């Protein structure tokens, strides 16, 4: 090294050995051969004191550079005080706190002129904003408000954080209702299939139900008549049976709803009897006075008018509603009147009726649950309607 120009250092692996102009060799920062502060190569045999101890750092700078600290020499540097322009006790004072133009944290304190003035009265705040020996009046005059009037208004950019409990309860209720409704729907949809199976089983007493359309012109594989494919001739009969079953279910629901409305007193209990005459008090349609005491719901039915007034007898509203339906149907279907003697005769045979009912319960008992079980999901719906309507 030394003055030997043949020793290359193209990438500057040795500190400050700048032989390549690309590493800053110029008139103010010459290369190694023209560096006035370089150590000559014969001095490299001497033991130097560097940052890593004796003999570990060459005397011509070492890997840490040319600074005294790199050579192991520690010097104390005096602290220079900051200029007056940056001193807190003199020069320009910082601008007092101003209300934010947009309040993106509504849960924080809302700033206004009164709250700002009270905050500036705090001695800790005054010590930061007033110079030494400042005003002795004890008040702080904030910077004049040159902003628009909108800056004094707290403009919220978002609503306060909603409590997670309210969010959970708000979503949990509809989800539970949706789940219960879906469960009831799936159970209700099994009612037509169960009734269809019972209906078709009446045609195959003592044997397994088999679709009769499989031996026709469009043969299909053996299947139940309750699950006919569309190509089976029995598919149309299956759809017809299920349509009748759906109408039957809707009729039951309608009857239950009308009975419920009648029980709540929302329907006239005493219908217009066919053939009744109009009296001075008008047609006998409603019961003016309950039969027994002041009942909340009407529980009587009008018979023939006596002396211009309705004579009420204590009959349950459900029986009154059944009588109303029978009278309504008798007016529109005259042939139903032919069934009255038969019904009266059948009711008169009460022991026979009870024996027949007992025999049917004993005969149909084992399969009665399978017939009634599909209607069980309807019970909660009927109960809710009964309670809340």
UniProtKB/Swiss-Prot annotation:
Keyword Membrane: yes
Residues in the Intravirion compartment per record: 2-242, 192-242, 359-364
Uses in biotechnology: Systematic vaccination of individuals at risk of exposure to the virus has been the main method of controlling the morbidity and mortality associated with hepatitis B. The first hepatitis B vaccine was manufactured by the purification and inactivation of HBsAg obtained from the plasma of chronic hepatitis B virus carriers. The vaccine is now produced by recombinant DNA techniques and expression of the S isoform in yeast cells. The pre-S region do not seem to induce strong enough antigenic response.
Chain ranges on the Virion surface side, renumbered to this chain: 2-170, 264-337, 388-389
Membrane-spanning residues: 171-191, 243-263, 338-358, 365-387
Free-text comment about domains: The large envelope protein is synthesized with the pre-S region at the cytosolic side of the endoplasmic reticulum and, hence will be within the virion after budding. Therefore the pre-S region is not N-glycosylated. Later a post-translational translocation of N-terminal pre-S and TM1 domains occur in about 50% of proteins at the virion surface. These molecules change their topology by an unknown mechanism, resulting in exposure of pre-S region at virion surface.
Protein name stated in the entry: Large envelope protein
Organism: Hepatitis B virus genotype A2 subtype adw (isolate Japan/Nishioka/1983) (HBV-A)
Lineage, top ranks: Viruses, Riboviria, Pararnavirae, Artverviricota, Revtraviricetes
Name of the gene: S
């Amino acid at each position: 090294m030394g003055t030997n120009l043949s020793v290359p250092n193209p990438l500057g692996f040795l500190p400050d050995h700048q032989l390549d102009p690309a590493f800053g060799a110029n008139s103010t920062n010459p290369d190694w051969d023209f560096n006035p502060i370089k150590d000559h190569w014969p001095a490299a045999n001497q033991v130097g004191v560097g940052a890593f101890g004796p003999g570990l750092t060459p005397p011509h700078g070492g890997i840490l550079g040319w600074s005294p600290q790199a050579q192991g020499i520690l010097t104390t540097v005096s602290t220079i005080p900051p200029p007056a322009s940056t001193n807190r006790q003199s020069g320009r004072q910082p601008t007092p706190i101003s209300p934010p133009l947009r309040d993106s944290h509504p849960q924080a304190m809302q700033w206004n002129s009164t709250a700002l003035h009270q905050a500036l009265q705090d001695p800790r705040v005054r010590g930061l904003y007033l110079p030494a020996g400042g005003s002795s009046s004890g008040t702080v005059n904030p910077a004049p408000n040159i902003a628009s009037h909108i800056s004094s208004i707290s403009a919220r950019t978002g609503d306060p954080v909603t409590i997670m409990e309210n969010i959970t309860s708000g979503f949990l209720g509809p989800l539970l209702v949706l789940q219960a409704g879906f469960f009831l729907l799936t159970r209700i949809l099994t009612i037509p299939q169960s009734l269809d199976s019972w209906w078709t089983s009446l045609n195959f007493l003592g044997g397994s139900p088999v679709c009769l359309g499989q031996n026709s012109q469009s043969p299909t594989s053996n299947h139940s008549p309750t699950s006919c494919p569309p190509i089976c001739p029995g598919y149309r009969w299956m759809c017809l049976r299920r349509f009748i079953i759906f109408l039957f279910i809707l009729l039951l629901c309608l009857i239950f709803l009308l009975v419920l409305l009648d029980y709540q007193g929302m329907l006239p209990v005493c219908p217009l009897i066919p053939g009744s005459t109009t009296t001075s008090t008008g047609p006998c349609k409603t019961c003016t006075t309950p039969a027994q005491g002041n009942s909340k719901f009407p529980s009587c039915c009008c018979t023939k008018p006596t002396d211009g007034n309705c004579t009420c007898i204590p009959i349950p509203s459900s029986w009154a509603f059944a009588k109303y339906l029978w009278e309504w149907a008798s007016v529109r279907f005259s042939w139903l009147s032919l069934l009255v003697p038969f019904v009266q005769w059948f009711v008169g045979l009460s022991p026979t009726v009870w024996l027949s009912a007992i025999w049917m319960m004993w005969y149909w008992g084992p399969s009665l649950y399978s017939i009634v079980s599909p209607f069980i999901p309807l019970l909660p719906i009927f109960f809710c309607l009964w309670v809340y309507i």
